[in-house]
Amino acid sequence: MKVGFFLLKFPLSSETFVLNQITAFIDMGFEVEILALQKGDTQNTHAAWTKYNLAARTRWLQDEPTGKVAKLRHRASQTLRGIHRKNTWQALNLKRYGAESRNLILSAICGQVATPFRADVFIAHFGPAGVTAAKLRELGVIRGKIATIFHGIDISSREVLNHYTPEYQQLFRRGDLMLPISDLWAGRLQKMGCPREKIAVSRMGVDMTRFSPRPVKAPATPLEIISVARLTEKKGLHVAIEACRQLKEQGVAFRYRILGIGPWERRLRTLIEQYQLEDVVEMPGFKPSHEVKAMLDDADVFLLPSVTGADGDMEGIPVALMEAMAVGIPVVSTLHSGIPELVEADKSGWLVPENDARALAQRLAAFSQLDTDELAPVVKRAREKVEHDFNQQVINRELASLLQAL
């Protein structure tokens, strides 16, 4: 069986879940080809990029120059190159293909692809990729069934939904299978009009062979708190910093490390300075994986207080939480998006309402008083939950079976 992966941009260092799924299908013995519209950063990649020689398996459909005018010239040239083909003309149907017809993306691809890309099934990551894949199949550029994975921003951001809701409704008719990563997103797809029989929840997961549980340890003094996340609004790190201000006022001894980079870095650093928390809150920025692991080993609790962004952007189910639970680090998070599908409140971790710094500070203060006897059953249930419901190897085998039955 041949499996194609259809991506808007590849590779992206932030999308390790895509890379992991691609290599898993290769490891399972499937023939794998990758189609991407745009080329990502091929210099700063994960080891699997080289190990599996993924460049040789990838075809980029929009290898374009930079700059708006240069892009349009290039697309016009590619369109003219294939103007003798029927599908190139069809791709210019504005009523049927919308913005991707107007900006010549589809016609340029049709103009340069003489022989269709074939696979038994194409897995499209993120809703917009599924939309484009379905259009290209209709135009004869790709041949095969299409399964679209919906993650988070593609099904929650108001900007995305304002543009793509009509496109998604077309995808529900044109596509073969919708794969939301949570029950919450499955319900949302149904409300948008997707037939229930075209929906199957397929979670992201973690490779349990990479995570050995550490011994249960009581919280230290000072309490070691850690977050590993991209620095964006929906990660709720501004709420965490406000909670730290309250903890400090209450006299709770702690140290908080925020690992990661992102567009909210300056805002978070300003908040730390404003609250005079430089002595207890650190932002080391990007760290290589071995240093992150060492810091995680030192941590007493993993904190991810996710919130809904001002633009509606939401998490799916954060893999960072799964990894912490798999290795035996207690987690504190929020009642946000699909997180309660992973963390059972007060049983496999602790959840507080979104945007509630006071509740977060209270939870962390209470956590600092727990002993190993109280923590042991929570940590055990957390790993069992990930092992049972978020085990990457099991999930990928189940997905492969589902696709083979399409």
Swiss-Prot record:
Transmembrane spans: none
Domain of life: Bacteria
InterPro entries assigned to the protein according to its UniProt record, in alphabetical order: Colanic_acid_synth_WcaL (IPR023884), Glyco_trans_1 (IPR001296)
Group of enzyme by EC: transferase
Pathway(s) of this molecule: Slime biogenesis; slime polysaccharide biosynthesis
GO molecular function, one term: glycosyltransferase activity
GO process annotations (BP): colanic acid metabolic process; lipopolysaccharide biosynthetic process; slime layer polysaccharide biosynthetic process
E.C. designation(s): 2.4.-.-
Keywords of this entry: Glycosyltransferase, Lipopolysaccharide biosynthesis, Transferase
Pfam families the UniProt entry points to: Glycos_transf_1
Family note: Belongs to the glycosyltransferase group 1 family. Glycosyltransferase 4 subfamily.
Protein name from the UniProt record: Putative colanic acid biosynthesis glycosyltransferase WcaL
Organism whose genome encodes this protein: Escherichia coli (strain K12)
